[in-house]
C-alpha cells in the first residue's frame, strides 16, 4: 500500500501537488480529475519499473489509501489538510477516485481507497478508544454522503474502516456500518480493509495507549472483523485466524468470501496478466516529474 493524497508518496521521486484542502479550495472537480490522472500515471510507471527491478517493498504497489474524505470542522485536528474541508457536497464532487482508477473497461489503473469510514474527524490522541456519538441526522447528512457517493458514483475499489468505535463497536467490526449500510444498503462488493493496527485495538492491552478492549483475544477480534466485512487488515492480528478457524470461531467459507474479493482486486489491476495486455503498463517512466506534470 501507499498514499497519494497530493502525489505518489514515499517511494522515491514523484511530482508533488498542493495539499488536498488547497485543491478543494479551487472548487474545480475537472482540475482534480486531471491532477489525479497525472498522479496515477506516475504511480503506474513507478510500479512497473519496480517490478522490472524486482523491488516488491511496501509503498511500491498499486493500492493507494487515498482520498481522505472525512469532514473537517475543527481546526484543532492536525490532519485536516488531508481532507477537502467542511462541506460534504464539495467533498463528494472532488473527482479524485476517477482520476486514480482510470477509465479502461477491463483494468483499473490503481485502487483508490475511501477513508476513514466512518465518523472519524479527530482528535488523534484518543482515536484508539473513542466511542463516537452522533445524531442520525448528522451521521447521514454530514459523515456518510461522501462515502455513499464514492461507492455508488465513483466505484471506489477499497474502503478503509476507521480506528474509532461507533455505537459501542469498533468501526472495523461494526455490522451497522459495514454490513447494513455499506454492503447491503449501498451495494458495495469490493474490498474493506482496516487502518494500521485497528484490529489490535479490539483486544490488545497497552497502559500507555488506551484501546477499545472489546474482545478477549486476537482470534476473537479477527474472526469478528472478517465476519462483519473487513477483508484485509494492516497489522498482525489476522495471523490468529488460523487458530480462530480451528476453534470454530470462523469457517473456511467465511474466509473464502474475503479471499475472493482480494484476488478479484488483483486480477482487475492486471497483476496476473502479461504487461502487453494491460494498457496502463505502457505508460513510460519519463512521466514521473515530467515538465507536463509540473
Which residues fall in each region the model found?
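Glycoside hydrolase catalytic-domain context in secreted enzymes
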Residues: 1-294
Amino acid at each position: 500500500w501507499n498514499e497519494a493524497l497530493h502525489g505518489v508518496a514515499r517511494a522515491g521521486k514523484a511530482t508533488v501537488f498542493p495539499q488536498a484542502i488547497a485543491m478543494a479550495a479551487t472548487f474545480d472537480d475537472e482540475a482534480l480529475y486531471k491532477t489525479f490522472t497525472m498522479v496515477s500515471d506516475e504511480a503506474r510507471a513507478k510500479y512497473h519499473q519496480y517490478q522490472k527491478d524486482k523491488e516488491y517493498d511496501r509503498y511500491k504497489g498499486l493500492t493507494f489509501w487515498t482520498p481522505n474524505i472525512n469532514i473537517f470542522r475543527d481546526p484543532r485536528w492536525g490532519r485536516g489538510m488531508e481532507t477537502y474541508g467542511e462541506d460534504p457536497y464539495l467533498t463528494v464532487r472532488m473527482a479524485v477516485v476517477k482520476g486514480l482508477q482510470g477509465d479502461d473497461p477491463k483494468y483499473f489503473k490503481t485502487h483508490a481507497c475511501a477513508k476513514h469510514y466512518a465518523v472519524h474527524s479527530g482528535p488523534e490522541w484518543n482515536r484508539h478508544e473513542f466511542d463516537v456519538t452522533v445524531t442520525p441526522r448528522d451521521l447521514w447528512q454530514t459523515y456518510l454522503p461522501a462515502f455513499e457517493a464514492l461507492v455508488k458514483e465513483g466505484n471506489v475499489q477499497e474502503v478503509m474502516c476507521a480506528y474509532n468505535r461507533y455505537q459501542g463497536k469498533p468501526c472495523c467490526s461494526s455490522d451497522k456500518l459495514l454490513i447494513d449500510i455499506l454492503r447491503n444498503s449501498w451495494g458495495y462488493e469490493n474490498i474493506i480493509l482496516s487502518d494500521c493496527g485497528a484490529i489490535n485495538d479490539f483486544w490488545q492491552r497497552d497502559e500507555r495507549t488506551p484501546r477499545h478492549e472489546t474482545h478477549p483475544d486476537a482470534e476473537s477480534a479477527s474472526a469478528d472483523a472478517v465476519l462483519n466485512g473487513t477483508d484485509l487488515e494492516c497489522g498482525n492480528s489476522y495471523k490468529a485466524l488460523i487458530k480462530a478457524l480451528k476453534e470454530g470461531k470462523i469457517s473456511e467459507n467465511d474466509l473464502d468470501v474475503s479471499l475472493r474479493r482480494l484476488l478479484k482486486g488483483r486480477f482487475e489491476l492486471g497483476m496476473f496478466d502479461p504487461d502487453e495486455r494491460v494498457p496502463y503498463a505502457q505508460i513510460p517512466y519519463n512521466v514521473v516529474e515530467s515538465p507536463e506534470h509540473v
